[in-house]
């Protein structure tokens, strides 16, 4: 089974630790990493990429000192290796204009406002990771016990049906 990376980026250590704690259940099947800056996030992505580990999902704060989360997500969307990545914005400070920019230019997949509920965050991450593996992994059967079983089996059935046509 392919290993994929979930990366959380937030410049506030308490927030980052809280998000990582909420995502701990994913650690059995994904590599879950945190970064306190865009530069640190880029380093993690590069190091994991050198090991053949793809970035499946990034959960990024918007307001950070060196670069906004939206600008970083736009940058990721411009590279072939990270374009398929599911991109989530976790913030309490993005205005309407920033959010529209993220949707239009960064292919934002989901917006989560702070404060968040742990169960809702995990459900959202599960759905986004399901979307990612359906689109990017050929061995879907491996994921049926981990992610959204019904959607994965439906996708497998649809692929078999379209292959036979």
Where are these regions (language model features)?
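Two-component/phosphorelay signaling modules centered on CheY-like receiver
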Residues: 4, 13-37, 80
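Active-site residues of response regulator receiver
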Residues: 10, 61, 91
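Helix N-cap/capping motif at the beta->alpha junctions
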Residues: 20, 34-47, 69
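Active-site beta3 strand of CheY-like receiver
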Residues: 49-59
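Receiver (REC) domain active-site loop signature in two-component systems and cognate sites
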Residues: 64-65
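Alpha4 helix (beta4-alpha4-beta5 surface) of REC/receiver domains from two-component response regulators
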Residues: 71, 94-110
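A Lys-centered signature of the CheY-like receiver
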Residues: 113-114
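CheY-like receiver
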Residues: 120-165
């Amino acid at each position: 089974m392919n290993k994929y990376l979930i990366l959380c980026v937030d410049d506030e250590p308490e927030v980052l630790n809280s998000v990582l704690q909420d995502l701990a259940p994913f650690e059995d099947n994904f590599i879950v990493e945190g970064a306190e800056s865009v530069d640190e996030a880029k380093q993690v992505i590069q190091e994991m990429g050198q090991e053949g580990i793809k970035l499946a999902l990034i959960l990024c704060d918007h307001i950070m000192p060196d670069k906004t989360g939206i600008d970083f997500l736009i940058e990721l969307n411009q590279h072939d290796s990270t374009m398929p990545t599911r991109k989530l914005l976790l913030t309490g400070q993005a205005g309407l204009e920033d959010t529209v920019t993220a949707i239009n230019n960064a292919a934002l997949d989901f917006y989560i406002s702070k404060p968040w509920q742990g169960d809702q965050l995990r459900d959202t991450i599960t759905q986004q990771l399901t979307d990612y593996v359906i689109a990017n992994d050929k061995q879907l059967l491996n994921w049926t016990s981990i992610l959204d079983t019904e959607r994965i089996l439906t996708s497998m059935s649809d692929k078999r049906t379209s292959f036979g046509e």
